[in-house]
Amino acid sequence: MCGIIGIVSSKEDKKIADKVISALKRLEYRGYDSVGVASLDNNKLEVRKAKGTVEEVISKKKVSEMSGYIFLGHTRWATHGPPTDYNAHPHVDCSGKIAVIHNGTIKNYKELREELQTLGHVFKSDTDTEIIPHLIEEFMKRGMDAYSAFRNSIKTLEGSYAVLAVIHGEKRIFFAKRDNPLVIGLGEKENYIASDIPAFLSYTKRILVIKDGELGFITTSNVFIEDKDGNPVDLSDRVRVIDWDVETASKEGYPHFMIKEIHESPKSIRDTVDSLISDLDLIDKIIAEMKSSGRIVVVGAGTSYHAGLYFSLLLSREGMNSFPLIASEYYNFKAKKDDLIFAISQSGETLDLLQAVRKFKEEGARIVSLTNVIESALARESNYKIYMRAGPEISVAATKTFITQLISLLFIYSRLRRDNTNKFRGADTEVERVISSVEGYAKLIGEELSKKTSIYYLGRGMSLPLAMEGALKIKEVAYVHAEAYPAGESKHGPISLVDKGFPIVAINDGEITDLLRNNVIEMKARGAKAYVISANKKISESDVEIYLDSIQFPALSISVVLQLIAYYASVSKGLNPDKPRNLAKTVTVE
């Protein structure tokens, strides 16, 4: 969940500090509590760090005044040790000549720390990361050169990591990766390495993805990588040119990334559908696997789980043996050799999902992945890879990536049923029409719901996953407690909480309208205030109803309405929906 950036330049320059600052700001969406920067020149290694926001730390520590030919930057999300100045990265060794930044969890850090302490090493933080510079120092004391010392240090670590290290006297950045994202940007007389592409997108579009178990170093003009067995890697076919631009990763006049990304949903749908249609051979191979599999297990976390639940319900309606699985509960499930796993993740780096996939692969299952990031860890673990084309999503709360997950899964389902998939060409215009026509109403509902302390979100059939996602969104960004459940379960307990003014949000996709109407009437009889989002058929018993007429893709259209409601509830409370407290965009620790 930490953000990482490293820059190595051919000349010593304060302008590199400005690039690091810019990169750190682009990494803020990952969630963090402290910030730090290291610079290296011919004379010294300097570290400045503190608890706080990027702006606060940059100003307080005068980071823009730092100079050097190598820089490291880090935004920390606390896992080992509280968020403090001394726990912020980078961490250094006893001599102050080695600096390290790290994302991940070192499982054997306590044993290594104790061993290093017996050798005389002094630690100044509570973090697991700090053992790494001390390990490098210890191996160099024993006569190893810098790279050998780094390699041996990495080999002693158990757990997950994306590590960058600099050593005084070395004009290169050392790196290692296991389970956490790390990508290289190739510039002119300057190279970059970061946890996310947007960190260096202003300076280069040429990237090189580092695979699990690899380590190496970058200089101003060279990249060296060796695999987990120590063999040099041929990089000739690794370099890719990405088609994102800087504007795509900026707010473009919107007050927040979240609302910008909701409005980008139509374009994301269009790009994703174009990609799916151009790759029908892959889709048909996946469908053949689905038909021949004994079970189809759809795995995801958070928003991705809700998309997976929607897909699993569709497959169950076709008589297929399918069920959804929350990624973090993977240890309760044993895969079989004829199982097909659908793994869904926006980032492709969610650790509990990766652990689930690796376990199921070992048990003989085949993996289909759906992700927004090309060559992500999840994609590399998969037999079949489907890429959404949502573009970068900066806001922590998933919006357009949920929509592109749904459109991708609906496309596969339609292809499975041999429906005409040309209808998907119109999905973008339908969602665009819904956003423009209902945003004002969604704003009013959001403002009302922002004043509530608890809300029920109700759905039946295919509306249930949408209700669950709507409840999650308003919890995430507006800090309002919301519970989603099948509307038919109301009399089995939940209705006991309903009294005068209690808000319910009923999701009606037009399939099971009559039964849902009865549930709304029951709630209103106990004093509830009913808000209804309907597609194609009205409930007409609500206090407030947003009605979407002539809708071909109710899941998409209803979802953007629920996202708008959550966004305006957040803004109404004066909150920043892009950075919900205690949350991060990508969960890469257990």
Curated annotation (Swiss-Prot):
GO terms classed as biological process: carbohydrate metabolic process; fructose 6-phosphate metabolic process; protein N-linked glycosylation; UDP-N-acetylglucosamine metabolic process
A molecular-function term among this protein's GO annotations: glutamine-fructose-6-phosphate transaminase (isomerizing) activity
Domain SIS: 286-422, 445-580
Cysteines engaged in disulfide bonds, as pairs: none
Xref: PROSITE patterns: GATASE_TYPE_2, SIS
Catalytic residues (positions): C2, K585
UniProt function note: Catalyzes the first step in hexosamine metabolism, converting fructose-6P into glucosamine-6P using glutamine as a nitrogen source.
Protein's recorded name: Glutamine--fructose-6-phosphate aminotransferase [isomerizing]
Organism: Sulfolobus acidocaldarius (strain ATCC 33909 / DSM 639 / JCM 8929 / NBRC 15157 / NCIMB 11770)
Upper lineage: Archaea, Thermoproteota, Thermoprotei, Sulfolobales, Sulfolobaceae
